[in-house]
């Protein structure tokens, strides 16, 4: 087979492969609020989503990123999560290299993010492109980097304001940044200020309106919570979100 024919065959196989994965992605239906969230993401360079737990905001952000990843072969997905420990259990330093220690400290949160993306794109695709077009990392490891693709920062209520600033400054030309969190979802008393709450005050007016053209926000209503109805009562009782 000639070189030109080989190129054509590879191109056809790749197109078929991408169509297969796009069909897989299209099997996942978004609810009305998740569709609204994605519309806000499309309209802005930076989108803040400060909402209750269990509204599907992480899934929705990864779903959007997966669409762009399949549509553009140059698009990258970078997921940033903080290794800050929550609650009273302090596990300290962990053995292993940076990757294993990071996964250990982030525990189920880091694993669940990978699992969602694996459901959307296929575990094989994620494993193949991890470290190439798909990255799971912590704030310290993006210091000095320029991220031109989709940058998703999750659980950002656990960040300090300066760490939030570090993440927001990574956005490259044509990139998008999606900031996820629940500013009231804190499980320990910290001397550091809530980075998400601080950012919301900096970038938006008291009535929620924009201060900057390319920076938007979205909040899910309480009825969007997908866990048992009693969780809504818990959120209401604590007066947080």
List PLM regions with ranges.
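Conserved helicase motor core of SF1/SF2 NTP-dependent helicases
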Residues: 2-26, 32-153, 157-241
């Amino acid at each position: 087979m000639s070189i030109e024919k080989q190129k054509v065959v590879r191109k056809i196989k790749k197109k078929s492969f991408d169509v297969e994965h796009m069909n897989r992605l299209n099997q996942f239906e978004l609810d009305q609020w998740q569709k609204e969230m994605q519309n806000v993401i499309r309209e802005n360079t930076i989108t803040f989503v400060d909402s209750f737990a269990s509204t599907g905001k992480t899934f929705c952000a990864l779903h959007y990123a997966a669409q762009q990843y399949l549509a553009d072969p140059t698009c990258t997905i970078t997921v940033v999560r903080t290794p800050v420990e929550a609650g009273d259990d302090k596990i300290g330093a962990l053995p292993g290299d940076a990757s294993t220690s990071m996964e250990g400290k982030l525990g189920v949160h880091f694993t669940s993010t990978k699992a969602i993306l694996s459901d959307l794109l296929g575990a094989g695709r994620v494993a193949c492109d991890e470290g190439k077009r798909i990255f799971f990392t912590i704030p310290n490891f993006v210091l000095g980097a320029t991220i031109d693709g989709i940058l998703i920062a999750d659980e950002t209520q656990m960040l300090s304001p300066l760490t939030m600033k570090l993440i927001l400054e990574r956005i490259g030309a044509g990139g998008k940044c999606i900031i996820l969190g629940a500013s009231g979802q804190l499980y320990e008393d910290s001397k550091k200020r809530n980075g998400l709450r601080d950012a919301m005050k900096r970038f938006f007016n008291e009535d929620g309106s924009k201060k900057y053209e390319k920076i938007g926000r979205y909040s899910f209503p309480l009825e969007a919570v997908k866990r048992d109805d009693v969780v809504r009562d818990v959120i209401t009782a604590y007066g947080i979100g």
